[in-house]
Amino acid sequence: ERADSGFRSCASVQTSLVMWPIHALGSPEQKARWLPRLRSGEALGCFALTEPLSGSDPASLQTRAVPDGTSWRLTGYKRWATNGNKAEVAVVWAKAGGDDARSIRGFLVERGQFQARPIPGKMSLRASDSAELILDGAVGEPLPGATGLGAALKCLNEARYGIAWGAVGAATACFAAARDYVKERKQFGKPLGAFQLVQEKLARMYTDIGLAQLSCVQLARLKERSALTPVQVSFAKRAHVAMALEAARSARDLLGANGITLAYPPIRHLLNLETVKTYEGTHDVHTLVLGKHITGLDAFA
């Protein structure tokens, strides 16, 4: 993500939201067929949960799956499917036989069964392939372990872990650009970096990035021991993305008018991070996750 959040989004979806559910929730046949191709990059996959009227409330999704002999037919409309225009397979979430969160199931839908259309006019994540998917009686193969909304949320938790790391990379790129600029740019007869207020901003960015790096290391240690909890991942995703956004804004400020041009990376990272703040659970949603953990009281509804 130090290069661009769009690149990390592509990799994050491929690994956490496509390969992981096939690995953890799929059948032996599904694993054998798809994981080698996805792992090598021969095939791309996408994850289709969000809909035009279902974002932070995924339980309200409207896509339906009905049995048709030995297969299932899916009908619905998905939006913001990263990699969707080039995906060979989509992990699609639909309601099967009911209208509550327990009826949600995950399906593998192959290219040719869905129509993908690019989402135009983006000012953020321009390097990311964002698509809307149209399913009109699409043939879907159920993932045996992907039952209930909780299965979809487990996938998202894997992706959020990667976002917590990636946001630190974006912040580091912004810090490096600002540091190099203020060492060379002169005003009032000396480098900008020689002014106290400039050094204060750099010191704050440096400290915040360092703390987030230490947090990532602790997350990894917990994950290696299978001790990492969804609340800890929400904590890190929320805190690290907010930190990276502030770093991007500070870096843009230190670059002055030059900071609004694409000659320097902070403004691009700033726009990208506005999207990262929203996807895989918005900043406010993760605030409520932490609030429930702290108080034991559910404030979602």
Residue spans of the language-model regions?
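Alpha-helical interface subdomain recognition
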Residues: E1-R2, C10-V13, L25-Q30, R37, ...
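Well-ordered alpha-helical segments within folded domains of soluble proteins
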Residues: Q14-M19
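Short beta-alpha junctions and helix-cap segments that line functional grooves
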Residues: W34, L61, Y77-R79, P118-G121
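A short, Trp-centered hydrophobic/proline-enriched beta-strand micro-motif
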Residues: G41-L49
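Conserved hydrophobic/aromatic beta-strand scaffold that supports enzyme active sites
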Residues: C46, Q62-R64, V89-W93, G106-L108, ...
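Short Gly/Pro-enriched turn/cap motifs at secondary-structure boundaries
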Residues: L53-S56, W80-N83, K95-G98, K122-D129
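Flexible, small-/acidic-enriched active-site or ligand-binding loops
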Residues: S60, R111-A138, P142
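A short core secondary-structure module
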Residues: S71, T75-Q115
